[in-house]
Amino acid sequence: MRSIRSFANDDRHVMVKHSTIYPSPEELEAVQNMVSTVECALKHVSDWLDETNKGTKPEGETEVKKDEAVENYSKDQGGRTLCGVMRIGLVAKGLLIKDDMDLELVLMCKDKPTETLLNTVKDNLPIQIQKLTEEKYQVEQCINEASIIIRNTKEPTLTLKVILTSPLIRDELEKKDGENVMMKDPPDLLDRQKCLNALASLRHAKWFQARANGLKSCVIVLRILRDLCNRVPTWAPLKGWPLELICEKSIGTCNRPLGAGEALRRVMECLASGILLPGGPGLHDPCERDPTDALSYMTTQQKEDITHSAQHALRLSAFGQIYKVLEMDPLPSSKPFQKYSWSVTDKEGAGSSALKRPFEDGLGDDKDPNKKMKRNLRKILDSKAIDLMNALMRLNQIRPGLQYKLLSQSGPVHAPVFTMSVDVDGTTYEASGPSKKTAKLHVAVKVLQAMGYPTGFDADIECISSDEKSDNESKNDTVSSNSSNNTGNSTTETSSTLEVRTQGPILTASGKNPVMELNEKRRGLKYELISETGGSHDKRFVMEVEVDGQKFRGAGPNKKVAKASAALAALEKLFSGPNAANNKKKKIIPQAKGVVNTAVSAAVQAVRGRGRGTLTRGAFVGATAAPGYIAPGYGTPYGYSTAAPAYGLPKRMVLLPVMKFPTYPVPHYSFF
């Protein structure tokens, strides 16, 4: 399995290559202007055709209908000659790259499109374009392609194809063989296959937007492979719809998001495995009702050539030479550069050992620890400050003046969900988050991914979410401090209530859990639930514990916190200040039995002198030992250390003779 570093190196090369083939902002703006202008002009052509078919109307009534055309479009769509215009191909899928910017639109007709309708739209379209913009466009008709070709006259040069089609053409083919009732086709009907291809392209665009647009790195890999199809003739037959299906299946079947380099390698692995070869699984077309192979148009030789080329590309990628597949210069390594080179021979050629660092190099600033520490700190800060901009700042730098809108706010009060949107080049992007700031950041990441810019802003989102959590915790801390002050004043000798509303754990002054520390001092305590108040999102529990005849209460948002609060109140009342010495309770270690008991008793009597009885306390008792803890050694629960106190020697220590006991063989099992 390859290391993550090698995948990161592939990601760097793929993203640099992607930045070179991605269209410039000027080209994207020109595409957006041209497509929007033609779409609006075709809408006016549709209105003009409807007015012509209905006959001459009064001027006032005509002007009113022109103004209400947009509002009544959905109602009158069934009776319109031109039902609508939709984007297909690279424009709808967002796969435009430099030197490969084929723009396509589909003009949907109510009836089967004819040459007469094509000429009518072609003649009226330039008139409507002149009303919308001052730019000059060349409009031509192509009857063989059932389309209208539109070209702009300034740089960058763009070509837009508007294909006429109708859903009646496909409905007619799907009728059963027994049905002979068919409408008579007009004599100047456009090419049926071209119209069917336009309908298929419309289905492909809808499928791509639903399945492939949401996959991470899928659009980037498709742009890289489209550039590969343009550069290498072997890959040219795979360009188009089959390539999109392969990428979606390869990347979408992974159980986790993939980076650009790893996603490209996964696609190459699928192609190199032989899925294109005869006898393989083939490539099912999901946009056709009948089982259809999307690779049926390719020859066997073409499939073998593509498989061989994919295997060679995968081999180069495995050896860290992906730059050869992308036809680019290798990028410098991201590893830190070593200052001293190690060679086998010295300058004179007589030495056989590696050169060491000269002694003079170590007499510089390294002798001063302050200067060395400052230099190391500067390196750390520089490495962390490589990219100080988050996704929102980066997008604002690329596209200034974007307007973010709040679409909705849902969820409960304690966990709201905000949905923000932004419109970029006619495309609306939406994202949600626990706050408006996070939702805007999510939207910015989506836009940057769609534009093809590298997005490594997961850390920014996590930082924002952590900041929001810290704000909430700071608010809760202020509440807890006030409540603790109030409860401290109302504490009595018989009962005490402590409420803590902090998000973090409750600890004593020694850094321990209050329940554990109180249990060490007084065993067998029982905590009782006194009350439970509040709604589902703001509960308040009160727990009570009785210690030495006194009752202490604690409150909190859950039983665990309330229990810890009650234990903390008991510790502060009974085991802190002047009451600590009186309530301190020493543990009694049970005496050993048999030979061990006799030996220990004799040793103790010998040390302490005549007339003394055996010790009733543990072997190690000192003033510095923590109450309730047994010093490690013989008789301890785990016995991982020698017979000595855990934190230094106590003032009073009994020395015991070393006792040896016979050991019995213990079976050992080995699994290696």
Swiss-Prot record:
Keywords: Cytoplasm, Cytoskeleton, Developmental protein, Differentiation, DNA-binding, Methylation, Repeat, RNA-binding, Spermatogenesis. The modification Asymmetric dimethylarginine is found at R612, R617. Interacts with EIF2AK2. Associates with microtubules; it is unsure whether such interaction is direct or indirect. This is Spermatid perinuclear RNA-binding protein. Involved in spermatogenesis and sperm function. Plays a role in regulation of cell growth. Binds to double-stranded DNA and RNA. Binds most efficiently to poly(I:C) RNA than to poly(dI:dC) DNA. Also binds to single-stranded poly(G) RNA. Binds non-specifically to the mRNA PRM1 3'-UTR and adenovirus VA RNA. Transmembrane segments: none annotated. Residues 5-363 form the DZF domain. GO terms for biological process: cell motility; mechanosensory behavior; spermatid development. Residues 477-497 have a biased composition (Low complexity). Residues 349-371, 467-514 are annotated as: Disordered. SMART domains: DSRM, DZF. PANTHER family: SPERMATID PERINUCLEAR RNA-BINDING PROTEIN, ZINC FINGER RNA-BINDING PROTEIN. Residues 387-453, 510-576 form the DRBM domain. Gene3D superfamilies: 1.10.1410.40, 3.30.160.20, Beta Polymerase, domain 2. Isoform 2 is expressed in spermatocytes (at protein level). Expressed in testis, thymus, ovary, liver, kidney, heart, spleen and brain. Expressed in cortex, dentate gyrus and Purkinje cell layer and granule cells of the cerebellum. PROSITE patterns: DS_RBD, DZF. The keyword Nucleotide-binding does not apply. The keyword Disulfide bond does not apply. InterPro entries: dsRBD_dom, DZF_dom, DZF_dom_C, DZF_dom_N, NT_sf, STRBP_DSRM_1.
